[in-house]
């Protein structure tokens, strides 16, 4: 393959989250395909011949047939736990969603920081050996979020479905010693909401019902500015109650569950976790940095990822950070409206830069050095 051809193909950007796969072409301003990273397998025996039943469904198709499927997420806490399913997800992304041949386009993948090294190597191996990519690259999610917000300095709180992490970046350099990771994100909040709803007498048990609860969380959840005060309001009036219609037409009412769910981000003890909340994690991350760069980090708190989409999270974060930081410190929380996809957008920006062309891991380099090349070439 001569170099001229290689320049032609538009790079693919694929952000494999624990909850959603965001995929598309570099240079676009939004991902073409966004679908749940779910693989569903039938729970029952097929009896009707000629229905074209499959042994596995991926993404939206699995979501729409969830009533008869067992749903599994191949990515947990940002780490791929089931590679066979992950291959199915990638296959679906390339051939059904984007409709391109992966052997013709370079592919930029994303990864959570502090992931096991084997995870990257296996990703690299599958891309080159199963999909025959001409070139690929693995990038840290939070760094891409910062690209998308147009900054070179800031601390990114990236909270998705499986993992939250804080990454301080100064003048384009990430500070690896100050990166903190918190295995508390959207999926834990969904599970917690399932438990809280059970206390109210609404039983949600199966993998399909969890998806309903996730929808309730996304549509009705919010972050209270003052949790105790909000609990009082909820107890004394019905102003906070909202109703939700289930797929079968039943209408349920939810009150204080709306903000109790998201409160677990700030008080992980609700989930029985002994870790610091997201605000303390950001603070601890800043305190691990050099004393000279802290001021700039406080003034550039960038939120990204789907779990930061709760209404009220910016104000609450501001309030919590102000109480933790020194009193004279200027604190700014940046919550861009497109933050649900900011990681993908950053990848799209990065992969379309002309200077990035030299960064790709080429197939020839992989053939020479094996999967370990990914640690040399990718930060």
Swiss-Prot record:
Coiled-coil region: none
The enzyme's E.C. designation: 3.6.4.-
Example of a GO cellular component annotation carried by this entry: cytoplasm
Keywords assigned by UniProt, alphabetized: Acetylation, ATP-binding, Cytoplasm, Cytoskeleton, Hydrolase, Muscle protein, Nucleotide-binding
Keyword ATP-binding appears in the UniProt entry: yes
Source organism superkingdom: Eukaryota
Pfam family, one: Actin
The protein's enzyme class: hydrolase
Reactions catalysed, as given in the entry: ATP + H2O = ADP + phosphate + H(+)
Keyword Hydrolase recorded: yes
Molecular function per GO: ATP binding; hydrolase activity
Prosequence residues removed at maturation: 1-2
Main subcellular localisation: cytoplasm
Subcellular compartments: Cytoplasm, Cytoskeleton
Chain positions with N-acetylaspartate modification: 3
Similarity section: Belongs to the actin family.
Role played: Actins are highly conserved proteins that are involved in various types of cell motility and are ubiquitously expressed in all eukaryotic cells.
Protein name: Actin, muscle
Organism per entry: Branchiostoma belcheri (Amphioxus)
């Amino acid at each position: 393959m001569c170099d001229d051809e290689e320049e032609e193909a538009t790079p693919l950007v694929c952000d494999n989250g624990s909850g959603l796969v965001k995929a598309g072409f570099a240079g676009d301003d939004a991902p073409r395909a966004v679908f749940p990273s779910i693989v569903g397998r039938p729970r029952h025996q097929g009896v009707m011949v000629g229905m074209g039943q499959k042994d596995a469904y991926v993404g939206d198709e699995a979501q729409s047939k969830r009533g008869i499927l067992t749903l599994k997420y191949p990515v947990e806490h940002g780490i791929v736990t089931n590679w066979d399913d992950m291959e199915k997800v990638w296959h679906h992304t390339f051939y059904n969603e984007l409709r391109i041949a992966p052997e013709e386009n370079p592919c930029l993948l994303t990864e959570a920081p502090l992931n096991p090294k084997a995870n990257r190597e296996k990703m690299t191996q599958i891309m080159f050996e199963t999909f025959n990519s001409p070139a690929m690259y693995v990038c840290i999610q939070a760094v891409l979020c910062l690209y998308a917000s147009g900054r070179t300095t800031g601390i990114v709180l990236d909270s998705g479905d499986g993992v939250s992490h804080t990454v301080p970046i100064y003048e384009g350099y990430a500070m690896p010693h100050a990166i903190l990771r918190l295995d508390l994100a959207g999926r834990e909040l969904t599970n917690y909401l399932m438990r809280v709803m059970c206390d109210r007498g609404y039983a949600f048990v199966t993998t399909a019902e969890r998806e309903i609860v996730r929808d309730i969380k996304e549509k009705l959840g919010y972050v209270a500015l003052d949790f105790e005060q909000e609990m009082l309001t909820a107890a004394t009036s019905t102003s906070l109650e909202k109703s939700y219609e289930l797929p079968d037409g039943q209408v349920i009412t939810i009150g204080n569950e709306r903000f109790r769910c998201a409160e677990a981000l700030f008080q992980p003890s609700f989930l029985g976790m002994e870790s610091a909340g997201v605000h303390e994690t950001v603070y601890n991350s800043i305190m691990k940095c050099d004393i000279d760069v802290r001021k700039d980090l406080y003034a550039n708190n960038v939120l990204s990822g789907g779990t930061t989409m709760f209404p009220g999270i910016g104000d609450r974060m501001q309030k919590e950070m102000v109480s933790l930081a020194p009193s004279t410190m200027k604190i700014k929380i940046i919550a861009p409206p497109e933050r649900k996809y900011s990681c993908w957008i950053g990848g799209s920006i990065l992969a379309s830069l002309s200077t990035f062309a030299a960064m790709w891991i080429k197939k020839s380099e992989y053939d020479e050095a094996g999967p370990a090349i990914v640690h040399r070439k990718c930060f």
